[in-house]
Amino acid sequence: MLKKNDSVVILSGKDKGKKGEIKEVIASKNRVIVSGVNIVSKHEKPAGNKKGGIIKVEAPLHISNVAIVCKKCNKAMTPKHTVANDGAKVRVCRKCGETVK
């Protein structure tokens, strides 16, 4: 499960290997927007007091094309969901056992 502010790495596409943080999760479409990744040019018409022109925006990526990066071992991982001692559900790195926030 991906959450906002998770540190992720891109697994496929033109930005393969780049790292960034999740800015937004679009759960209904299984997509995420990652900061600084998948930049596309968008043509906007002027409307009201807003200028028109070509602007750069971050486009959504499918969740299958990103993986969470463990801060301790610095590798892409799929987290394991476990219950902590205090009863809270936590995500844990399968490789090193570090808790992912």
Swiss-Prot record:
Q: Is the keyword S-adenosyl-L-methionine in the record?
A: no
Could you tell me the keywords of this UniProt record?
Ribonucleoprotein, Ribosomal protein, RNA-binding, rRNA-binding
Superkingdom of origin organism:
Bacteria
Provide any one GO MF term from the record: rRNA binding
PROSITE patterns, from UniProt? RIBOSOMAL_L24 (PS01108)
- List the GO biological process terms: translation
Question: InterPro entries from the entry?
Answer: KOW, Rib_uL2_dom2, Ribosomal_uL24, Ribosomal_uL24_CS, Ribosomal_uL24_KOW, Translation_prot_SH3-like_sf
- Name the Gene3D superfamilies for this protein: 2.30.30.30
A single cellular component GO annotation? ribonucleoprotein complex
Is-annotated flag, keyword Ribonucleoprotein?
A: yes
NCBIfam families this protein is in? rplX_bact
- Chain's role: One of two assembly initiator proteins, it binds directly to the 5'-end of the 23S rRNA, where it nucleates assembly of the 50S subunit. One of the proteins that surrounds the polypeptide exit tunnel on the outside of the subunit.
Which family does the record assign?
Answer: Belongs to the universal ribosomal protein uL24 family.
Q: What name appears for this protein in its UniProt entry?
A: Large ribosomal subunit protein uL24
Q: Which organism does this sequence originate in?
A: Elusimicrobium minutum (strain Pei191)
